[in-house]
Design a protein with these regions (language model features):
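GST-like domain detector, emphasizing the conserved glutathione-binding G-site
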Residues: 1-128
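GST-like fold's C-terminal all-alpha helical module
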Residues: 107-192
Length: 192
């Protein structure tokens, strides 16, 4: 039962990094296929996966294609209920889903102003007020998650999909030397 995961370069593609972490960190069997995000071949590379048009995309062992990170997350959690993709405790699971949904649709200033990259640190970057507001929201959500955390360094104690979804935020915090609390810095250090 091996999945086929279609992603771009995880060094620069936050969505590809999330897709990869969803399988890799939970030891789910997969083959990674690289999509040419930056080489002009993306449309052709994605054509066999239609109607999926963005990364990550996942093909199940049965041949079904899943596009969009949240759909992939829910499908994997449903198919592997004992893998611990979501927190076991119901209230923590509710919060984890909420955080992932907000991650997918939010933080536009942070995304736009600090493109995800794992290749270097821009120590001289000066964040805008909008980026600082996004960072404040991230810290609020992380504190909200930790209220339901059991023992462990991750957002909900044990590693979960919420950590996979926020890993690129940690990459941005580290890569642009963004101003966050000591607790947020510690979480990012654990994540990276």
């Amino acid at each position: 039962m091996t999945y086929d995961l279609y992603i771009g370069d995880r060094t620069f593609s936050s969505w590809s990094l999330r897709g990869w972490l969803m399988l890799h960190k939970f030891d789910l069997p997969y083959r990674a296929h690289m999509i040419g995000l930056y080489g002009g071949t993306m449309a052709a590379d994605m054509a066999p996966l239609a109607p999926a048009r963005l990364v990550p995309a996942l093909r199940t062992p049965e041949g079904d294609v899943i596009g969009e990170s949240l759909a992939i997350a829910e499908t994997l959690a449903e198919r592997h209920p004992n893998a611990g993709l979501w927190p076991a405790e119901p209230a923590a699971r509710i919060r984890a889903r909420w955080l992932c949904a907000e991650m997918v649709g939010g933080f536009g200033a942070l995304r736009g102003g600090c493109p995800m990259q794992l290749a270097y640190v821009d120590a001289d970057f000066v964040p805008t007020d909008a980026i600082k507001a996004d960072l404040a929201r991230v810290e609020t959500l992380w504190a909200f998650a930790r209220e339901k955390a059991v023992d462990g360094p991750w957002l909900f104690g044990a590693y979960s999909l919420a950590d996979a979804f926020f890993a690129p935020v940690c990459a941005r915090i580290a890569g642009y030397n963004l101003p966050v609390s000591d607790a947020a810095q510690a979480y990012c250090h654990t994540t990276l």
